[in-house]
């Protein structure tokens, strides 16, 4: 991460921003080698779907076999925390300002969108990874794939 994100954001807001960022980030193959978001989002979605049933299974298995409840609860809590860790990482990433090279690339893509006649809201502050995700998603939907040749 280039610079530190705003530390005044609460934990719950970070998780919500992470979920929004996960939904916004374009899952395009061309971006996978450049950004870890595709892998983190896929692992987080998998964890959201699989880990709660796994936690319940772990608890019921230990209770049914008369095992110790403490390790079963610890395992269940760890399994449920994995998707939260992914959402937290995505939330922190979404509010992180872009490094200078990515900011330049962001402005180039934004300029191409404006040249093609797309209406974009004016930037009020330094671009973050969330604004990059918004612009990339719009560029993949509206522009041809040649805008990626600059990478």
From Swiss-Prot:
Record localization: Cell inner membrane
Membrane topology label: Multi-pass membrane protein
Chief location bin: membrane
InterPro entries for this protein: UPF0208
A cellular component annotation (GO) from this entry: plasma membrane
Lineage top rank: taxon: Bacteria
Record's keyword terms, sorted: Cell inner membrane, Cell membrane, Membrane, Transmembrane, Transmembrane helix
Pfam families for the chain: DUF412 (PF04217)
Transmembrane segments: 46-66, 69-89
Assigned protein family: Belongs to the UPF0208 family.
Entry-linked HAMAP family: UPF0208
Protein name per the record: UPF0208 membrane protein ECA3038
Taxonomy of the source species: Bacteria, Pseudomonadati, Pseudomonadota, Gammaproteobacteria, Enterobacterales
């Amino acid at each position: 991460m280039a610079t530190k994100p705003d530390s005044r954001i609460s934990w719950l807001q970070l998780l919500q921003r992470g979920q929004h960022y996960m939904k916004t980030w374009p899952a395009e193959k061309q971006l996978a080698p450049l950004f870890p978001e595709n892998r983190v989002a896929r692992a987080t979605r998998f964890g959201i779907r699989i880990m709660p049933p796994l936690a319940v299974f772990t608890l019921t298995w230990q209770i049914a076999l008369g095992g110790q409840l403490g390790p079963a609860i610890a395992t269940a809590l760890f399994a449920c925390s994995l998707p939260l860790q992914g959402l937290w990482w995505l939330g922190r990433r979404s509010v992180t300002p872009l490094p200078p090279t990515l900011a330049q690339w962001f402005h180039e893509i934004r300029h191409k969108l404006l040249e093609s006649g797309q209406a974009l809201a004016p930037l009020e502050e330094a671009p973050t990874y969330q604004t990059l995700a918004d612009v990339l998603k719009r560029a993949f939907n509206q522009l041809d794939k040649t805008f990626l040749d600059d990478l």
